[in-house]
Amino acid sequence: NAYEKDSHFPGYYFQTSFIVAPSGDVILRYRRLNSMFSPSPHDVWDKYLDIYGLEGVFPVADTEIGRLAPIASEEILYPEVARCFAMRGAEVFTHSSSEFASPAQTRKDAAKICRAVENIAYVVSANTGGIRDTDLPPDSSNGGSRIIDFRGEVLRLSGPGDSSGASAEIDLTALRRERRKTGLNNTLIRQRFEAYAASYAGHAFQPANSLLKKDGSLRAPKREHFVETQKSVIARLAKKGII
């Protein structure tokens, strides 16, 4: 994923995951919803929906190698993101990330398995090959790329090194057969969304439209804004006794 400008939101940039077809055409763009210090579509939610609609928020690419949907970095920790893609038929989550590679299981590693099992989907997670010009150790992210099948099994895992990679066969026929089986393990089709909808609708944690003024103009996306927004959410939830 990379940072991308949008003429509808002058002065802003979004963290964008994208998929390029063999023709060279960009066939999918997804703007990261959960970002700490950069604008998110949710920060300008009403205007973003007016322009792109909800399907533009959760795009799925129907390709010859399956129905693909991107998950950006830390968002692997947010099950709702993957679920919204699965609702739209996603079969393979392409997870571009930059994270510490560790021989011990990290919380992101655990989340990758969970997202695969919950949605009966493949997770193809690609880590960065090193980090430069930061305060972080330059080789801290070498390794850790992996392919996880729809049962939660890690098919391939790359180790550290400048020329390490991971490859495995993705069996879409088996995945689709699994999704159409009856039984306990079909966690996707057994979802009872109506039972959860009211709880989601009745609670606001991170607020929508925090960068959108009432007159439709945009606030400057300064780092301080995101920190203060998070502090106010903590204070509000603590006052309610939620945290």
Residue locations for each model-derived region?
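A generic structural signal for ordered alpha-helices
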Residues: 39, 59, 63-64, 90, ...
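Active-site catalytic loop in hydrolytic enzyme cores
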Residues: 4-91, 101-114
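CN hydrolase (nitrilase-like) catalytic-core segments centered on the catalytic cysteine
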Residues: 67, 73-167
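Aromatic side chains
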Residues: 13-14, 30, 78, 122, ...
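C-terminal beta-strand edge segments of enzyme domains
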Residues: 127-243
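Short, flexible, solvent-exposed loop/turn segments with mixed acidic/basic and small polar residues
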Residues: 1, 60, 155-159
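Glycine-rich loops and low-complexity Gly/Arg-rich segments
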Residues: 25, 43-45, 52-56, 85-86, ...
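Short beta-strand-to-loop element that shapes/binds the nucleotide-sugar donor at the catalytic cleft/hinge
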Residues: 1-6, 129
